[in-house]
């Protein structure tokens, strides 16, 4: 029997290799074929005109009449090519030329015959504000649904676990440290969750991270269940929570909406069964299925380097069945799987769809969010892995040349820019509403403006992570009287997210409108020199309040401009009056050193304020 199974798997591997090689050899015929325009990638105007045998001027005129000035080298988007085909009376169809760079995506997108699909467990992510009970809820569900001797044995390192309900149905929970991890995977194109459970404390209501979690869940476009936690507390007010969430479009079924609300207590284990039953009901309505009878594919949840065992990856199987000795490609890494563990650290021989497991045997550490595919041909896997690395390097190079506010006029004129996505952060709710209303009224021909978050507070890592999930067009994070810290600025630079900071509302509107018209003033640029935290205050009758500080990042120069930032909000912007180090006048103080300063015409310095030194540069 074992020999028979081994032979079947060997034959399956040979068929897979043969099929991949065949796909790699096939060339797609493009152009007009039987009245259908077939294409594989975006074409320039001149290339498109040649393929459909139409005059170049006909295409240029078509877009000129729409207010778009194109030239023969302008790259047409897929939408534009489709629009032109309809204009000239053709159907159109996209075909994919399979290469080693895109074969993984081709394999992942393969649609299985309905007869091969079987029901799979739902994959659930719990999100919400810190201290609203997310960890307690996860722990209570774990402990209620696993054997007592195993309950404490679930490893946190795996990033997910699977439970069996009282009705013998399985549910997989993604155990992330916060919605940042969830968003980070989405920014890499990995959709891992089927259902989001939004947890809100009945005694606290909607809080800032609740709003952020709602933004992330809506962008993921998955069903949402609201779990109102802590109803056992005397001050619990679940109706208040339901009313507050209406503002975000989450309307309870009892009020005529379509969002299930469950009132319960994670710590007292009230209505946990009802939550699980609701998850199963929604999963059945969503008709979640997968094909378990093929080589596995899925996504990497977490990964690290173990000194003794080498690269270790927690993966979630989404299709097929993963087995020991399978050859896996994960992102730019590959290897033969030597060992598979479940969430209890038990060795398992295989993992079916929706099952999270830990695998050993990859040649390097993959990244969270990397997609994986099993290709049981080591030579082929190595070649595809190397091609993936080359593709990643090329994509990183292209990302660095992406849209910027300074150059959007050219991109709009050439029809390349269709969407501008904005995140708005401000010091007060009044400022948020004013900016949101003003920005949403801006009319740029051929461009849609989307505001995906507008809230009070400093620009945070969560804002940058959310911005990174946007795959199309220009993304800008606008800060009004608020600032990012050094860590957030660094993350924004790494992810190529543009941050624009203002303290006058009309300047925000003017900047975006002028950029679209191509008259944005590029003459000046603000350069942040350093940030320091106030750790002590000293009063002096002659010179006022001295802020004793520690430099966190960069330098604080004597001749720089200075901002005072409190809880992410700018409370003063002015000039340094005096700068000292160890009671001696100083020209500058570097990161890791302490000093003291006074500010011209400002004495309301408080401990834990942030001093931000900056200068305005003339751009030549």
UniProtKB/Swiss-Prot annotation:
Pfam families: EF-G_D2, GTP_EFTU, IF-2, IF2_N
One GO cellular component, as annotated: cytosol
Region (G5): 265-267
Location of region: G1: 128-135
Region (G2): 153-157
Positions of the tr-type G domain: 119-288
Residue span of region G3: 175-178
Chief subcellular location: cytoplasm
A GO term for molecular function: GTP binding
Residues bound to GTP: 128-135, 175-179, 229-232
InterPro entries named in the record: EF-G-like_DII, IF2_II, IF2_N, P-loop_NTPase, Small_GTP-bd, T_Tr_GTP-bd_dom, TF_IF2_bacterial-like, TIF_IF2
Domain of life: Bacteria
Ranges where the record places region G4: 229-232
Entry-linked SUPFAM superfamilies: Initiation factor IF2/eIF5b, domain 3, P-loop containing nucleoside triphosphate hydrolases, Translation proteins
Intracellular or extracellular location(s): Cytoplasm
Physiological role: One of the essential components for the initiation of protein synthesis. Protects formylmethionyl-tRNA from spontaneous hydrolysis and promotes its binding to the 30S ribosomal subunits. Also involved in the hydrolysis of GTP during the formation of the 70S ribosomal complex.
Family named by the database record: Belongs to the TRAFAC class translation factor GTPase superfamily. Classic translation factor GTPase family. IF-2 subfamily.
This protein's name: Translation initiation factor IF-2
Organism this protein belongs to: Mycoplasma mycoides subsp. mycoides SC (strain CCUG 32753 / NCTC 10114 / PG1)
Gene (name only): infB
